[in-house]
Swiss-Prot record:
GO terms for molecular function: phosphate:acyl-[acyl carrier protein] acyltransferase activity. One of its GO terms (biological process) is fatty acid biosynthetic process. Homodimer. Probably interacts with PlsY. This is Phosphate acyltransferase. It comes from Vibrio cholerae serotype O1 (strain ATCC 39315 / El Tor Inaba N16961). Pathway: Lipid metabolism; phospholipid metabolism. Its EC number is 2.3.1.274. Pfam families: FA_synthesis. Disulfide bonds: none annotated. It catalyses: a fatty acyl-[ACP] + phosphate = an acyl phosphate + holo-[ACP]. Its main location: cytoplasm.
Length: 341
């Protein structure tokens, strides 16, 4: 069994050690091969461990940091003043090969800037991209990128996102994933020059199973295994999907918990539906991977609870086991070789 180490930014996210420390302890129980390094204020971390009746040991260690990068801090400022920060030190542990992956729920822009600066990009990649799995009506997953690492992208970057997304999805599916570009229509004439140019590049690449365009109403229908878009569009779509799913879950939960005859009827009729809808809960898919780097970095939701952070750590574990950066490099090399000839 391969031992692996995850550096967890214990101060990242809205709740800091109150959530990250219990999540680390739970993750250790899920993965016997896992070691976690908690990076943050040692006093706060130790305090939370004491509440759990736990203490640092050979599988759970603490690296003290004096500073936290705030959510309002600009990436350029965070980059200049990252020394001693929990996020910066967690990324450094990966750069120094003391950890196999980093997980943080902190400032997304700062995380991308620091990761890109400390870990460097893979050869052939111009920009990293955030990717996450989305649930679909069939029960399968769809991987969508970019989800906000870049506000705007050119056609070459979208093409690289497609290559990276395909490499990641292939490790899960064990077959060539269906790759599509998010567009305002499925017809070839639809869309702006950006998506048309990227579609042309993907059509000419046999190493990618490109199936064309899909529309926003197909995101959760299992129409594609990988959906490619720029970060602005992707982030808006992701949050719209999450908000809609949460609305349905909350509405149904309110009906099921009602004490009136209406609530009793709802519990009888919709309890199975509620169980199905819970599979759409965004917390179950927490953990967006920052692809294109020489190391593994996972972005957790800032508002994530304990179970959601456990899911982000789990994603880090799976990516380490699947050697995702190496797989992306291999896929990119094959694609570039094909385009060269």
């Amino acid at each position: 069994m391969q031992n692996l180490t995850v550096a967890l930014d214990a101060m990242g996210g809205d709740f800091g050690p109150r959530v990250t420390v219990p999540a680390a302890v739970q993750a250790l129980s899920h993965f016997p091969e896992l070691k976690v390094i908690l990076v943050g204020d040692q006093h706060q971390i130790t305090q939370q461990l004491s509440l759990l009746g736990y203490s640092a040991d050979t599988r759970l260690s603490i690296v003290h940091s004096d500073r936290v990068i705030s959510n309002s801090e600009k990436p350029s400022l965070a980059l200049r003043h990252s020394a001693g920060s929990s996020m910066g030190m967690a990324i450094d542990l990966v750069a120094e090969n003391q950890a196999d992956a980093c997980v943080s729920g902190g400032n997304t822009g700062a995380l991308m800037a620091l990761s890109r600066f400390r870990l460097k990009l893979l050869p052939g990649i111009d920009r990293p991209a955030l990717v996450s799995a989305l649930p679909t009506i069939s029960g399968r997953k769809t991987w969508m990128l970019d989800l906000g690492a870049n506000v705007s992208s050119d056609a070459d970057s979208l093409f690289q996102f497609a290559v990276m997304g395909a490499a990641l999805a292939e490790q899960h599916l064990q077959q060539a994933p269906r790759v599509a570009i998010l567009n305002i229509g499925a017809e070839e004439i639809k869309g702006n020059d950006l998506v048309k140019r990227c579609a042309e590049m993907l059509t000419q690449t046999q190493a990618i199973n490109f199936i064309g365009y899909i529309e926003g109403n197909q995101l959760l229908t299992d129409a594609a295994d990988v959906i490619v878009c720029d970060g602005f569009v992707g982030n808006v779509c992701l949050k719209a999907c999450e908000g809609t799913a949460q609305l349905f879950i909350d509405k149904l939960k309110k009906s099921l918990l009602a004490s009136s005859i209406k609530g009793w009827i709802a519990r009888k009729l919709f309890s199975e539906l509620f169980t199905e809808l819970k599979t759409l809960n965004p917390d179950q898919y927490n953990g967006a991977s920052l692809l294109g780097l020489r190391g593994i970095v996972i972005k957790s939701h800032g508002s994530a609870d304990v179970s959601a952070v456990v899911n982000a750590i789990s994603e880090a574990v799976h990516e380490v086991k699947r050697q995702v950066p190496s797989r992306i490099s291999d896929r990119l090399e094959a694609v570039l070789l094909e385009r060269h000839y």
